[in-house]
């Protein structure tokens, strides 16, 4: 039996029953769209704490009108309503205003709420308390339903079934079917169906994610009601936008009739009255329509809304709902996504894609807001994430919606030019960081206007749309100008720097990581600017080649000449994208790696940091809201996997993921480098951002970019899809988290399904001309005649190759190898043993303090520990050392060959086969017995006895002794150590040092590998 996916009391999305078994993978992929993961269902009524979250989850929209999922018959419970084009404008006040600061902010405010239908019983009492509840959002049909059983104060039970749809593309229309059924009640029922002035948006308070303009509201100009119809006219309190909202009704079934109407300034509507007996129902349909325009004539707006409402009232709810479902079915035919073995994830991915599609504007005049039109978060502003996350998804699932977003940017290009002049740029256009109408609305320029990367983000979206659709008309008429005008800014904020070898350096910007601001050579900005400039040059070449008349005319009008494009090419080629030679990673910017790490332990667990920490405190430390470097890797051309791996490892440690966008890019990069467990964890985080309210602000609307990011995490991550080139590239992999999955994309008029399971990757061209794709480097030509089965590439192994800072000498004749942390993990046993001693003497001690003891002999370690004790220690030093050793021996008593690190024996054997002599150089006096238990003692030619040493590490004595015993000069030896003290000792002895572990900790090692399994002797031994 297949039941709806639902929200349990714990708030997790889960199937109410397991999916029924299927005889084949094909059957599971082709499950009907009435199945369990096509419906979001809750079976508990919302309370004061969950009502706003629930209203966001069950919001309906069509890109024009957004209606939150409230309860019609509950006083104040119907929820807010938004129109994508309706906003108010408020001035921004500064104590100190400087040139170029934003002057006003636009805020999308709630408009008239037309869903309210207050129900009272014969005695005038309310329905009472909720005793049963079910709410369903049907992702296949695009409609919602809610079944609520009420029990009145007198004990009578009535059930409400309320169905909703926002059914007509391009029109601001809400349709409701409302059924009242008596369970055991006999008597009259009154329904007060009304239009209500939209409530005031939630005020900002201390949460900047709401925005300073939050709390604004529309001003009601007039209201009127006549019979089953009512109208309310509003305007912005500061802006010139006017709206008209009209409601009308159809009385469908039961003993129900119009009793009267009412009109107050803030509320107007119809009074309906009926009678019920047990088992009887009253059914009515309500149509709510909106019309709006800047400086619109009130009478004309009212007439337009009345015509829209009347026309669709005649059609009826069921027909409207069915037509809407058919239109949505076309979308799912082209964009379905499946993960049949993980129904919870499958439902979340479908939910997110559904919400992205229904919240994207259609008119080309408004942008995709960060929260869509599902709530008031971020004031309804459109940011960079519309282009970086939403557009790549929509370009291959609903291209017209991606085009609409780009048309919005093109339509506001003149305002972007004006913004550039405000920012002292003589030419070009600067896209505003946050906007509704096209003007900069950010009052905080370090985190707003300084994010110049938005220019490259828009160009990135144009390129993806261009590649996926081949829409040459858009490029010629709008896209080219958008790309070229925004490209001009880079030469005005960057320069060729002779102090850095002529590298093109971009200064004074902020990248996507908003916990770092106003820096030079932000890696993401530079990487995206490089791609932007290269694409701009490509666009110029295409205009000249493919449009010999229109192309030169456009370039002439813009004043783009050969000298300018040549400078663009040189800047792209010389872009500053350094690799830190010590850590082997890309610095996020010129200063990031020099800052102290964020103290996670001292800061505590309160998140997000932006609500608890001053921005300057964040700017001074290595801490990322989201990692700019990781995001850059996911969006731009590939680099060597080892470098990606090091970047991933480094920035994962310093990223707090306070941005809802962060998990998506980490998931994609993790899949790219073969870290599939991490890819799965990050995929879950991005898929459930809203369903589980992971960032604590879904109350104020859904995260559109995170919704898109979950699709990208599966399709770009697992599917290895890359749409940046002329030919779409795929490299699908499987993992336990998604052993079977499928997705569909549109590519230049072709419909392609990619299905991955144990048999391989099945490419099915569902429609259109033959299509050439790249499958893991293999060129495949697909036709509609038959599917093409290709082998599934294995996930890439983790590419933690050696970071070589200094080339080794030749020849290398011997290897000096530490034990703890190199061949086996006794580090935890040492830590626990020292922790027991620390607790005994009252010395504060944790794993961070333990780092100072690594590689240091027992007595020296004890001295370090004693210095942390609050008072003199009575026990003798030798007694404490013996006690520590006793603890340690107990902990390792059961060690055996299975306790070797993966790849350790193989590395030792490979060293012997390469002709190297081996010596064990452990400071542990238990080393000999331990390597015997590990079964590798016979692989060593010599083991230095720590008891014979006068000095411990970092003194070089142990390494010099080992080299002498092997009859090899220290300069012909290579040493393996996991601790800083060991590396320093190797270097003091003149031995080539290879650190095993973190490059940031082992910053003085000649080379670093993450673990011994990654060691390749041939890299160091030469030919």
Where are these regions (language model features)?
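Acidic/polar, glycine-enriched structural segments that form the non-catalytic walls/loops
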Residues: 3-378, 613-614, 797-802
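C-terminal capping/lid segments that line or modulate ligand- or cofactor-binding pockets
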Residues: 52-83, 389, 437-438, 515-543, ...
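Asp-based, Mg2+/Mn2+-dependent phosphohydrolase catalytic module
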Residues: 805-813, 909, 925-1023
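Helix-terminus loop motifs that line ligand-binding clefts
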Residues: 360-374, 400-460, 466, 473-477, ...
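Active-site neighborhood of HAD-like aspartate-dependent phosphohydrolases
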Residues: 808-851
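Non-catalytic C-terminal accessory modules of carbohydrate-active enzymes
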Residues: 103-153, 159, 641-645, 652, ...
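Active-site core of glycosidic bond-cleaving carbohydrate-active enzymes
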Residues: 382-410, 477, 534, 538-541, ...
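Short, acidic loop-to-helix structural element flanking the phosphoryl-transfer center
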Residues: 890-920
